[in-house]
Each structure stands twice: as structure tokens, then as C-alpha cells.
From Swiss-Prot:
It catalyses: a 3'-end 3'-phospho-ribonucleotide-RNA + a 5'-end dephospho-ribonucleoside-RNA + GTP = a ribonucleotidyl-ribonucleotide-RNA + GMP + diphosphate; a 3'-end 2',3'-cyclophospho-ribonucleotide-RNA + a 5'-end dephospho-ribonucleoside-RNA + GTP + H2O = a ribonucleotidyl-ribonucleotide-RNA + GMP + diphosphate + H(+). Binds 2 manganese ions per subunit. Its EC number is 6.5.1.8. Catalytic subunit of the tRNA-splicing ligase complex that acts by directly joining spliced tRNA halves to mature-sized tRNAs by incorporating the precursor-derived splice junction phosphate into the mature tRNA as a canonical 3',5'-phosphodiester. May act as an RNA ligase with broad substrate specificity, and may function toward other RNAs. Its cofactor is Mn(2+). It holds the Pfam family RtcB. This is RNA-splicing ligase RtcB homolog. Transmembrane segments: none annotated. Mn(2+) 2 binds at C124, H261, H355. It is an enzyme of class 6 (ligase).
Amino acid sequence: MMKHGKGEDVFKYIEKTNEKNLYRINKGLVPGMNVEGNMYVNEKLKLLIDEEIKMYQLNKSSTFLPAVIQIANVSTLPGIVKASIALPDVHAGYGFSIGNVAAFDMNNEKAVISPGGVGFDINCGVRLIRTNLFYNDIKDKQEELAQLLFNHIPVGVGSQGFILCNQNNLDDALSLGMDWSVKEGYSWIEDKLNCEDNGRSLYANSDYVSVRAKKRGITQMGTLGAGNHYAEIQIVDEIYDKKSAKLMGIEKKNQVCIMIHSGSRGLGHQIATDALIEMEKVMSKYKINVIDKQLACTPIHSPEGQNYLKAMGAACNFAWINRSSMTFLARQAFSKVFNQSPDDLDMHVIYDVSHNIAKIEEHFINGKVQNLLVHRKGSTRAFPPFHPLVPLDYQYCGQPILIGGTMGTYSYVLTGTEKAMENTFGSTCHGAGRALSRNKSRNSLSYSDVLSNLKEKNISIRVASPKLIMEEAPESYKNVSEVVQTCHDSGISNKAFRLRPVAVIKG
């Protein structure tokens, strides 16, 4: 693992371009860069990047790598095309930074797939459900709704779901994704139509999921988990693009929505762990030398690469079922409080997006269509109007992009653009991105102050683990509005509407 001796050695490779909010990470920052890095940050967010670099320089004995170095490291991987891309919410992660997009040429036999480019929580993502309710309808029931959602949706580390699976059921679920949810009565048919990939990965094969991974997943279907995962009752706070919002069923301020942020739980984590161990063992066979062992990888078309792709697809299906199951539970909770059916309450899924995934997609490179394996880690697909993979309902506005904020802050719905297709492989940000480590958050923030701040904003909170109050406080994250505005100003996504939370459920 390479280490720079002086701060200026890093900074001199970072160059501001003529394009708004775009910095270039030039070749030479680390040995063996195949392509440059492109980093989308405004001046305020750039200061956080600079602080990460300075911290790295001061602590020479640490194994910590700042996001800029990680972006450059990814550019050394075999088969990468165009650039290693950092989005405004970028921060240091495992191997790849969180907020990194990297695409690899499927026609290059040396091009690789890397579990670090997806993350441990495979298909961590966000779902947004609208209702025909407005804030006046729920303000006297806010605490009741918060408690009922907390009671209905299993939360926290090790939480167990209400869907009891046996081995055969789980194998079917891992293969079918949301088609399984529809078959079992947990989803409406329309739900999957407004879900990325219709809620089913065609790469999935449960035979490539280890017994240990299945054992971890079998009890966790329909569970929120912990960390930054949440279910929130939100209200529409601002509408920027009335036409796009209307296509999503949003016409007025104060309309009530539910946002669910969760992933593939222990099953996905185990699949990632299994793949990293396997790939570390065999890299020498393929003559792959990585600059950081956390970038363990194998050729896409190798047996190990294909095995991971199939297991990852199964984890994606599990995550879509997981969010579908919690949608079912949220619909039950609202139905119980308002004594109306979910259909009468217009509880339709607006969209469901992933922000930890690798997928084979077609993109134009140097004027030619190429099949690429696009790794998105802490980044969201952002396909434009009239793209064939955008649902029929959204052909005129582009794919909805769901950007979750932090506990007590705004969330956003954006739409995809042609410029994203040209510059970022059809990708944009995924959220706020951490600014403080979990440990620093626990040590520097006060439990009572964070709760008091939420109370002042009239936000109901239910949390299974009190330490999460500090870890997930708004002060622990970058300003999500800055992140979203940077993407909007850069043209890689457009703002449609903004939401603010009135009730937060966390693990």
C-alpha cells in the first residue's frame, strides 16, 4: 500500500477543470493509473475532501486511505474505461470509496469485477411510497403512526422478520426477486414495474450462495437492520419540477410519503465476505497485482468472477424482497390507523433504486456502444428520459432518483439526465455521505442535544439502539442539500421535489 510523504504530493495531482464542480485527479497520484479520476464536488464539499487528505498525511502509521487515493487506486484496475468517478457524497470506504463509479469493458478478457466496488450491503437502496394523505391528516396521529411502524417493522442488529422461510422458499426468493413477493402476496404487480430492473436480477443463481449466507438471510427477510437504515414518514416540502413530480403522483406540498432505506442484511454481507476471501486466494493465478488488497478482484469472465456475479444477483433479489416486505408492513400500519385499504390510501411505490450494485449496461465510449460492467458503490443509477430501461410512467421525465438525507434532514427526489449518461455512466449521488466516523460521532455529540434538536423540528423518533442517535445525527454527515445541488448544477441529475421527515424509525 503506497503512502505519500508530503501533503502537497497529493494536492498537486488534483486539478480544477473548466467544467463547473469538476476536479480531475491526474495520472501519477498512484503508480499504474490506467485512467484519470473525475471528482464532482463544489467548494464546500472539496474542503471536506481536503481535510481527509490532511488527516491521512498527519497519521503516517494509519492504514486509512482518503477517498482521493482510493479513487486513484481504482483507476489502476485492469479493464477500467474512461475514468474512476467520485460523486459529491464521496468518502473513504473499503477498497473503493463510497460514492465511486467505475466501469469495466466486458469485451476485455482482463477486465475485472471487484466486491469492494459494490460494498458489503449488496443492493442497499431506497424505496419511496406515496399516499393521498396530507400533513393535516396525520399531525394528530404522528406519534401513533411512528409507534405502529416501529412495532410492525423489525429493526436493529440481529432482528428477525415476520416472513418465515424454509430452504426451498429462500432459494425461490433469491432466484425470483420481486416476482416471488408478488406471488406470495407481499407486493402489488405495479410495485415491481416501478422498481429498478423490475425488482429482479437476471444474473441471480442461489446455487452460488453459501450455506452460511443463506442461514444469515433466512430469518432476516422483511427487517430494517441498523446503522444508517431507516423507515421515515415524510412530507413534500418543496416542488422544483412540477411536471416530473406530477408524473410521480406528487402535486402539492405537504403530501405524505414513506421512505424505506435498507439492503440485503447479513446474507449480502456474507456473500461479499465469501467472494473477497475467494478472490484474494486466486488473484495470483490471473497475474493480478492490486495496489490495495481491499481491491481483491478477478476477471469478469473467470469462474470466480461469474460465481460472484450470480451470488450478488441473488443478494440483490433478497434486498428487493426485503424492501417489498417492509412496504407490505407499512401499508398494514397506515391501513390500521386510517381504517382504509392501502389502495384507497393510494399507497403506490413511486420508485425503488439501488446504490450498491454492479450491472452489465450499454454505454457510448468514444462514439461506440460498449457493454460495460458498471460498479456503483454509494451511487445511484440516473438514466435519462426515453431510455429503454426507464419505466413507462417516467419516460418523459427520466428515471426517479431517491436521495435519502440524514436523521432529521431533507431527502430529495431527482431525475436522470443525458449528461449523466455522457459523463458518469448514468450515475449520480446516493445521499449525504459521512463527514464524521461513527466513533467520533459518539464521542463528540450529545444524546440529549440530538434528541432535543429533533423535538424542536417536531420529528417523532423511534430507535432500537440509543448509540445510533449520535452516530446518525445530521452533524455526522455532509449537507445533503449541498450534495444534491452539486449534482444538479453539474447536470448529472435534476431536482424534482424535496421531502422532510416527520417520523423516523431506526435500528
